């Protein structure tokens, strides 16, 4: 990271913050009834939702279908996200969080 220009470093920080905000938006939607269409809207068209407990959903249609089941499965949820590790590499990024919910 020391070889980056100031502009590149600022862009990286802005990208990381945008990813955090997206994750927080997702959490708020989950905690407001797991609305399938709203959940899918925070993903790219070819986005992937993955969980050890619930499997993998690829794309908006599969994500919406998965979350339709969650609407009746969960009467309450509270997503508390912490300890993000976000790796930015050009136009792509990966992130992991701890969740207490």
Language-model segments: residues:
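Short, low-complexity N-terminal intrinsically disordered segments enriched in polar/charged residues
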Residues: 1-36, 41, 45
């Amino acid at each position: 990271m020391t070889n980056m220009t100031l502009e590149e470093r600022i862009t990286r920080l802005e990208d990381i913050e945008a990813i955090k905000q997206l994750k927080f938006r997702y959490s708020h939607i989950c905690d407001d009834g797991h609305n399938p269409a709203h959940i899918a809207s925070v993903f790219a068209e070819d986005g992937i939702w993955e969980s050890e407990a619930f499997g993998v959903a690829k794309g908006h249609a599969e994500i919406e279908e998965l979350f339709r089941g969650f609407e009746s499965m969960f009467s309450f949820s509270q997503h508390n996200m912490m300890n993000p590790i976000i790796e930015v590499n050009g136009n792509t990024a990966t992130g992991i969080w701890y969740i207490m919910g």
